[in-house]
Structure formats: C-alpha cells, structure tokens
Amino acid sequence: MDFSSKSLELCKSHSNQTDQLLKISKQTYEKYDNSLSKLHLIIRELNKQLIILKETSTQFNDRYNTFINDFTSLSNQKQSLFTSIENKLEILKKKYLDKGLVFKNNNNNNNNNNNNNNNNNNNSNKSTEDDNNENNNNNDVNKNNNNNNNNNLNTLYDFIDIESLELIKNQFLSELSGLNEICDKSKQIYKSTNESNLEMENRFLEIQKQYNKQIEESNSLSDLLTQQNNLYKTIQNQLINVASQCDFITFYKPSPSPLSPSPSPSSSSSSSSPSPSSPQQQHDFNINNKKEQIQLLLTSSLENIQLMSKNVKDIENQFKESCSIYTLVYLLNEKLSFGNDFSENWETFERFNCIFEQRLAGANYFIGELYSLGKWYDLFDESYDNLLEEVKRRQKEYLRQKTIAEQFNEELKHNYNQEIQNRLKFYDSYGKYLPVSLFSTISDQPISFQVKQIIEESVIDYSFNPLNLKRSSPINQQQQQQQPPPNS
C-alpha cells in the first residue's frame, strides 16, 4: 500500500475517532446537565423534608425542655420545702407546753366523763353490782390513759402526726422518682433523635456543598465541550487538508520539459546534491514536501485526538463526581425514611407525656399538701403563742368579773340589811297597830339576791380545733368548711 492510501486510512481512522469522541462528549455533558437538574429538584425536596423534620424536632425539644423545667422546679421546691418543714418541726420541738393548761383540760374531760358515768348508773335501776364495778374499772383505765397521754405531751411537736407527714413526703418522692425516670427515658429519645437530625443535616450540607461545586465546575465543563467542538473542527480541517495533499500526490503529473544537453561528467560530479532543475526533480521535491506536510498534519490531528480523549475523560470524571452525589442523596433519603422509627419515638414520647402529666399532677398535689402542712405548722406555733395570751386575758377577765360580782354581792347584802331595818322601823312605827288580816305579809322577810358562779358545759360549737392537728388535717378542715351547716 502506497503512502497516500496509508494516509487516507489514517485520516478515516482519525475522523471516526473524532466523531466518536465528540459524540461521547456531547452525550456525557447532556447526562451531566440532566443530572444537575435532577439534583436541584432532589435537593429542594430534601430541604423541604428537613424543614418539616426540624419543626417537628423543635416541638419535641420544647416538650422535653418543659419536662426538664417542671422536674427541676419540683426538685428545687422539694429541697427548700423539706428543709423548711424540718426547721419548723425543730421549732415545735423546742416549744414546751404549759402543763397547767394540758392537765387542766384533761382533768375537766375526766370529770365530765365521770359525771356522765355516774348519771348513767343512777338512772339504771336494773344495773347490777358487776356493771358498776366494770364502769369503775373503765374510769380507772381512762384515767390512766389520760395520765399517760399527758406525760407524753411535752412540746408542740408531740401533737404533730409524723406518720401522715412521712406518708405524704414518701408519696411525693415516689411521684418525683417517677418523673425522673420519665425524664431519663425521654432524654435517651431526645439524644438519639437530635444525633440523627444532626447527622442528616450534616449530610445535607455535604450534598449542597458538592452540588454547588458541580455548579461552579459546570461552566468549565461547558468550555471543555466548546473546546471539543473546536478541536473536532480543527481535526476535520486537517484531515481534509491531508486528503487534498494525498490527491495531489496521487494525481499530480509533471509537465514535459524541452530537450537540454546532457550534463558533462565533470559537472555532474562536481554537484554535491541534486537540485530541482529538471521537471522530474521538481516533481519529486513537491511530492516529498507534500508527504512531509501530510505527516505533520496527521501528527497534529493525532495530538488533537489525544487532547479530545483527555477532555472526554475529564468530562466523564466530572459526570462521575456528580453521580457520586446521588450516593449521598441515597444515604440521606434512606436516613429520612426512618420515619417509622421517628413515629415510634414520637408515640413513645406521647405516652411518656401522658404519664408525666399524671405524675406531675400527683406531685403538685402532694407538694401542695406539704405546703399546707408547713403553713399549718406556722399557724399552730403562732396560735399556741396567742393561746397563752388568751389564757392570760381570760384570767384577767375572770378576776375583773369576780371583783365586780363580789362588789355587787356586798352591795346586795348591804341593801338587804337596809331593807330589813326599814321594815322593822315601819313595823315598830305603824305595822304593829294594823290588823294581820289587813296586811298578812307585813312580817315577811325581804327577798334576798346574790351573785354566784355558774359552771356548766360550753354550748359553743367550735368546728375547728387548732390544737388537734391529728384529727383535723387541712384537707378535712377545707371539706368541713365547704359543707353547709345542719338545719337547727
């Protein structure tokens, strides 16, 4: 095969390669462009889902923070309240009772009980001696119990029902422990959910970063495609030029030249190189020149083809990088599809919320009871101090009224004696001269009056006894106050 045929074969091969490379470049760039468009839509949709997820997570976090705030508030109140109650109880322990008040009150109760028992025995005509002995024994037992109770009552603290107080405290601590357990379980859900959300957010940011990088590089890729088109045109022009040169070599024939004398041997030997002086030599020179041009063109076209191949690889690599974003998108979408897990966590959290509200209501109720007890302990202490003042006031009032009564008794006695003297004087002066039938009561004694102390059971019904805290809790007192009074 001659030079022209080989060159044309190379031209054909180069042309096919350039066609294929340009086609691949255009197809790859089109795929790349479509990929970026799809990525734009996918990223926008992912952003919407992440916004919804973030809003839901915000609600979740708000509720969790409410849990923590409520629990922390109760814990702080517990510490201060328990300390306050302990301090108040210590004050009550140091507040010693006036034994005169306690023993006097119980002795009066014993006397009333004995009087009631005696009245019952007197009214029972059919009661036997054994019954009387049993009543006497009961009176002795009651008396001993009262004495024992009096011996146990030394301070105001002895009136406090510690068992009920400890029961309320333990119930409050139980509710608080339940709240703490719910907070711990909610914290685990809160932590795992936030970690998952943070991971998805970081993945989305990475996708956005890669996408923005592809957008920036898309301009260079467009320039690369333009370069491919220009290289394609250059190679085609070079191949056309090669084909033209090959046609020249194939079809070119030198024109006949006039006869010339043959060169002398001396002249031929003296020439060092052939010169294109003859037509044949000129023809050979042109042919060689064309061959050199063809080789240069083929070499240049091959270099351009290699450059096109390199550009194709760059375009394909860029497309592969864009496709790698789909792997990140797939992973994020798979993570977002954990909606079932999130729904289960949300349902679990809703159940925790219901339990938390119930326990919170119970804890608030018991802490309210403890606050009420603390307030009543203050009122008890204050009331006892006022009770001592009231006893002094009553004693003073009793002495005042006693003084008035004694003075009035003296005045009544004086008036009575004065009345007797007046009647005797009237009788001596006039009465003895009158017939008895006319004034039969003339010798009667005057009616006497005197003031005496009357001791009877109190008719005042106190619906609230501030000293009997064991039998009158703040709750019972409130219920009693809310009940309507009985019809008289």
Swiss-Prot record:
GO terms for cellular component: Atg1/ULK1 kinase complex; nucleus; phagophore assembly site; phagophore assembly site membrane. One of its GO terms (molecular function) is molecular adaptor activity. It comes from the Eukaryota. InterPro entries: Atg17, ATG17-like_dom. Keywords: Autophagy, Cytoplasm, Membrane. Pfam families: ATG17_like. GO terms for biological process: autophagosome assembly; mitophagy; pexophagy; piecemeal microautophagy of the nucleus. It is found in: Cytoplasm; Preautophagosomal structure membrane. It is a peripheral membrane protein. Residues 103-150, 257-284 are annotated as: Disordered. Residues 105-126, 134-150, 265-279 have a biased composition (Low complexity). Belongs to the ATG17 family. Autophagy-specific protein that functions in response to autophagy-inducing signals as a scaffold to recruit other ATG proteins to organize pre-autophagosomal structure (PAS) formation. Modulates the timing and magnitude of the autophagy response, such as the size of the sequestering vesicles. Plays particularly a role in pexophagy and nucleophagy. This is Probable autophagy-related protein 17. It comes from Dictyostelium discoideum. The gene is atg17.
